[in-house]
Amino acid sequence: SPQVAVDCIRVNFEIPVLLTQAFLNETRSWKGERRVMNISSGAGRKSVPGWAMYCSTKAALDRFTAVTAEDQLGKPNPARLSAVAPGVVNTGMQGSIRASSKEDFPNVDRFIDLEKDGKLQSPEDTAKRLLNYLNSDEFGKEPISDIRNISVGD
């Protein structure tokens, strides 16, 4: 529906963009290091049937983060940015996905199997890995990253 599309754009793209821009503007005179981590998704990097809005808004967030990171390079005290895919995390969204019909979401069986096989990451472990990455020297070297591919001292 149009409202679902608007909500998806707002949550996955508009709000992170506005927060990022506000942070960068308000902190541009800071002497300390500035870092911005936007939470992306692997779905923004490939097509997932039934997820047109989710995939496209996460792809837009990836591109916004990458361009903003590049724009920062020429500035005094440039901020480091990265759009990070956190992996498949056992959140409320996962429950909603698994409750989907095959008609609405053709890949539903894959997500049911991920839970059944214990392959979902816990929110707590994911948050720890994201914070470790945010605080590491590696943060921002790649403006688009996937936490599953980064060694962050687990």
Predicted regions and their residues:
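Active-site helix of classical SDR
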Residues: 20, 57
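Residue(s) in the substrate-gating loop at a strand-loop-helix junction
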Residues: 41
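Active-site loop-to-helix junction immediately N-terminal to the catalytic Tyr of the SDR YXXXK motif
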Residues: 47-55, 67
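A short helix-coil junction within the Rossmann-fold of NAD(P)-dependent oxidoreductases
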Residues: 22-33
